[in-house]
Structures are given as structure tokens and as C-alpha cells.
UniProtKB/Swiss-Prot annotation:
Subcellular location, record wording: Cytoplasm
Gene that specifies this protein: aat
Protein origin, superkingdom: Bacteria
One cellular component term from this protein's GO annotations in UniProt: cytoplasm
Family label: Belongs to the L/F-transferase family.
Species per Swiss-Prot/TrEMBL record: Hahella chejuensis (strain KCTC 2396)
PANTHER family linked: LEUCYL/PHENYLALANYL-TRNA--PROTEIN TRANSFERASE, LEUCYL_PHENYLALANYL-TRNA--PROTEIN TRANSFERASE
GO MF term (any one): leucyl-tRNA--protein transferase activity
A Pfam family the protein falls into: Leu_Phe_trans
Gene3D superfamilies: Leucyl/phenylalanyl-tRNA-protein transferase, C-terminal domain, Leucyl/phenylalanyl-tRNA-protein transferase, N-terminal domain
Claim: Cytoplasm is one of the keywords in the record: yes
HAMAP family registered for this protein in UniProt: Leu_Phe_trans (MF_00688)
EC number(s) reported in the record: 2.3.2.6
An individual GO BP term: protein catabolic process
Protein name per Swiss-Prot or TrEMBL: Leucyl/phenylalanyl-tRNA--protein transferase
Length: 234
């Protein structure tokens, strides 16, 4: 593996075009998780992803997985579920609980990349109005949700969780619809998986992704994080 740039206390990143092809998108190492550095990273198509026993690793894969509202696919069975499930939704009511639930062991793995330092970093971003969560409720129980960053007219999804069937899908679909209603242009999904692709996510080149960010993350854009759509309206 070629030597990677090591970040110091100065606030900078290498250009994403210098990222490795294998492993896809690995760009640089080190630095910190200060809110200013994290925001700069996302604005430039870069995100941190590392395990507890690793230094901070920064990534910008090519291609990039995104979803736009016009590509959102909701199956008939999912529409019925959303109409009749009895689930309710909120924004930013329990951000820390959502991140902790995303970090919990899954049925297929006990590993997590959401370390204690990552939890603190994204909680700091939440406190300054950059990171947000959507919560899915079954009465008073938190059964699903996801979190990410909102910068300009782009939302950068980080992780989702589900404690009952379809709860994470419901969170994702509701978020995509609400972001569209607010005027967002796209959601960054980072890397593809079957779950996201089944909902309409697609892959675009890193070059195209960066050209979109260059315009959209600089948009002067703010709004209250309050539900304005009917999440059961299908």
C-alpha cells in the first residue's frame, strides 16, 4: 500500500482524487474529529471511518452512492406498511440515543465503527446544528432511526438502525421525502448496499459528486427541523 498523508493540527485535506483505488477511497490518516475538521471533510466529499484500534482513517470512495427524491422507490407493500404501521416520527428529539442504537452490535457482527470518540464528535456537531437525527417510535419505544449531517442543500447520511422490521426503511423514506419538501438536492449514502439500492439509491462518479457539492454545500440554507409532510400519506 502506498504511503498515505498524515494530517496534523492544521485544518486541511488532500484532494479526494488522490485517494487509493484499493482499498477504494482511502485518502489519509490522522488529524482529529473537531467539528471544524469534520465539516470541512464532508464539504469536500470526505468522511471518517475507522475501528477502535485504528487511527482516524479518512475516505472518499469512487463511485459514490447517493439518492435523490425523484429516484426514491417505495414498494406497494412498503406503502401499505407506512399507511398502517402506527409508527410516529420526530426529528432531533433523541440524537444521542439514535447514535448509540446505531453503534450497538448487530445480529451479523459485534464490531462497530461508531467509537466513543465518534459519538462525542457527532454529538458536538448536533449541538451546533449540523448533525441531525430522525426517530421512529412505536408508542414510547424508539424502534428505528438514522442520523447524519446537513450542510447547505445536502444531507450526509451516516448510519441507521432498526429494532423492528421496516423501521429503518420507514426512517429513510420519511427523511428523503421531508428533505425534498425542504429543498434538499441529494442524500449522500457513501457506499452502496442492497438495502439502499432497493430504495432507489444509485452510484455516481466521485467527480460528479464533488461538482454537486461545490455548489450545494455553499447554499445559504436553513430551516426548522419540524415535520411538514404526512409520513403516512400514501
Amino acid at each position: 500500500m502506498p504511503a498515505l498523508p498524515w494530517l496534523d493540527e492544521n485544518l486541511w485535506f488532500p484532494h479526494p482524487d488522490s485517494a487509493l483505488k484499493d482499498p477504494n477511497g482511502l485518502l489519509c490518516v490522522g488529524g482529529d474529529l473537531h467539528p471544524a475538521r469534520l465539516r470541512l471533510a464532508y464539504e469536500n466529499g470526505i468522511f471518517p471511518w475507522f475501528s477502535e484500534d485504528q487511527p482516524i482513517l479518512w475516505w472518499s470512495p469512487d463511485p459514490r452512492c447517493i439518492i435523490r427524491h425523484e429516484d426514491l422507490h417505495i414498494s406497494r407493500s412498503m406503502r401499505r406498511f407506512l399507511r398502517n404501521s402506527g409508527l410516529t416520527y420526530s426529528f432531533d428529539q433523541h440524537f444521542t440515543l439514535v447514535v448509540q442504537a446505531c453503534a450497538a452490535p448487530r445480529s451479523y457482527s459485534n464490531e462497530t465503527w461508531i467509537t466513543r470518540d465518534m459519538l462525542q464528535a457527532y454529538s458536538d456537531l448536533h449541538q451546533i446544528g449540523v448533525a441531525h437525527s430522525i426517530e421512529v417510535w412505536r408508542e414510547s419505544e424508539l424502534v428505528g432511526g438514522l442520523y447524519g449531517l446537513a450542510i447547505g442543500r445536502c444531507f450526509f447520511g451516516e448510519s441507521m438502525f432498526s429494532k423492528e422490521t421496516n423501521a429503518s426503511k420507514a426512517a429513510f423514506i420519511t427523511l428523503v421525502r421531508q428533505l425534498h419538501a425542504w429543498g434538499y438536492r441529494l442524500i449522500d449514502c457513501q457506499v452502496p448496499n442492497p438495502h439502499l439500492l432497493s430504495l432507489g439509491a444509485c452510484q455516481i462518479s466521485r467527480k460528479e459528486f464533488l461538482s454537486i457539492l461545490e455548489i450545494e454545500v455553499r447554499a445559504d440554507f436553513s430551516h426548522p427541523w419540524k415535520m411538514t409532510i404526512d409520513p403516512t400519506g400514501y
